[in-house]
């Protein structure tokens, strides 16, 4: 089997250190399935992981994947050889930048039948991230009618996570306010279903007041938590909930949350597979719900760019694009 990996952490300005490696195709054990990978999607987390310490070389990144089950471990009950599945994997195992991959069945689901592989593969990592935020952290209801009247502000609505988060929030009854800064990203947010799109390069508090937007129940920050920390505290309702997927780079005053009794949470969708939590199966269930909503027409895929062929050059170019931080939607590589 072919893999694209690297032997030491590197920045892109050092040149392309991705290389092709060959190894024997693995055999699935326990609850693992062996997937022949058809397409992958590259995420910002790939660019961060590329710069982290390599404990075992070569390091093979890649999280989102779609492919065909080729073999199953003895404890597998959810899948059979021939099933087409999608998933987001885990950073403590070999990634999807390869022709074959082992993955636990608990974080996998059957892929939607009504869209292409390079469309479906845009959804697992970002979709699970958004589902965990809305249902595990914000604890919104699975009954859309019970969420009517509640609102969420999604900062950076045109990114991969923001794109699917907007659709999920709308599907389950929330009023959705997102942010963007360019005409094309504003139009994309509207296409995803946002009720209101604000400019995140201008004062959000002022825009809320000018447009007479009430304080929101929830805020989902998908970009630069430090920059928006104080703004989010101003825009959240008392007893509201803020969740971010972006780690702090600076010290922030947690006491500032006290006056409104705000709950602040970090979302990291890899926590379940890394620690093999007892409820890891939730990721399978969330992916099943994504498939159901894609097939019923409630969600749309978020793929905007597709590269043909898994190669060091294509992977390097994908990382370059993501590090420019101007991507709309998701970037996919067909194997």
From Swiss-Prot:
Keyword Zinc tagged: yes
Cysteines paired by S-S bonds: none
Molecular function terms, GO-annotated: oxidoreductase activity; zinc ion binding
Pfam families in UniProt: ADH_N, ADH_zinc_N
CDD domains: AL_MDR (cd08252)
Keyword terms, alphabetized: Metal-binding, Oxidoreductase, Zinc
Entry-linked PROSITE patterns: QOR_ZETA_CRYSTAL (PS01162)
UniProt keyword Oxidoreductase, yes or no: yes
Domain of life assignment: Bacteria
Family designation: Belongs to the zinc-containing alcohol dehydrogenase family. Quinone oxidoreductase subfamily.
Name under which the protein is recorded: Zinc-type alcohol dehydrogenase-like protein SAR2277
Species of origin: Staphylococcus aureus (strain MRSA252)
Lineage: Bacteria, Bacillati, Bacillota, Bacilli, Bacillales
């Amino acid at each position: 089997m072919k893999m694209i990996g690297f032997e030491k952490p590197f920045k892109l300005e050092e040149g392309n250190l991705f290389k092709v490696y060959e190894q024997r195709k693995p055999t699935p054990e326990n609850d693992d399935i062996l997937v022949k990978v058809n397409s992958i999607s590259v995420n910002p987390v790939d660019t961060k992981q590329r710069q982290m310490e390599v404990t075992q070389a070569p390091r093979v990144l890649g999280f989102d994947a779609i492919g065909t089950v080729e073999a199953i471990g003895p404890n597998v009950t959810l899948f059979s050889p021939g099933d087409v599945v999608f998933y987001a994997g885990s950073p403590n195992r070999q990634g999807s930048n390869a022709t074959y991959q082992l993955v636990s069945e608990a974080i996998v689901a059957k892929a939607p039948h009504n869209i292409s592989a390079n469309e479906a593969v845009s959804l697992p990592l970002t979709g699970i991230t958004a589902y965990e935020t809305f249902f595990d952290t914000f604890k919104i209801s699975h009954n859309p009618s019970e969420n009517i009247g509640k609102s969420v502000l999604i900062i950076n609505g045109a990114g991969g996570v923001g794109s699917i988060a907007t659709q999920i929030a709308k599907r389950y009854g929330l009023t959705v306010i997102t942010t963007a800064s360019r005409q094309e990203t504003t139009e994309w947010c509207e296409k995803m279903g946002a009720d209101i799109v604000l400019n995140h390069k201008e004062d959000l508090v002022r825009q809320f007041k000018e447009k007479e937007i009430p304080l929101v129940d929830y805020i989902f920050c998908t970009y630069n938590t430090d920059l928006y920390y104080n703004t989010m505290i101003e825009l959240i309702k008392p007893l509201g909930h803020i969740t971010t997927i972006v780690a702090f780079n600076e010290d922030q005053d947690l006491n500032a949350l006290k006056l409104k009794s705000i709950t602040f949470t970090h979302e990291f969708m890899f926590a379940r597979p890394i620690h093999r939590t007892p409820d890891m199966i939730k990721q399978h269930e969330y992916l099943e719900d994504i498939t159901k909503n894609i097939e019923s027409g409630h969600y749309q895929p978020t793929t905007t760019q597709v590269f043909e062929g898994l190669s060091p050059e294509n992977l390097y170019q994908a990382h370059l694009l993501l590090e420019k931080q101007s991507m709309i939607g998701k970037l996919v590589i067909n194997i």
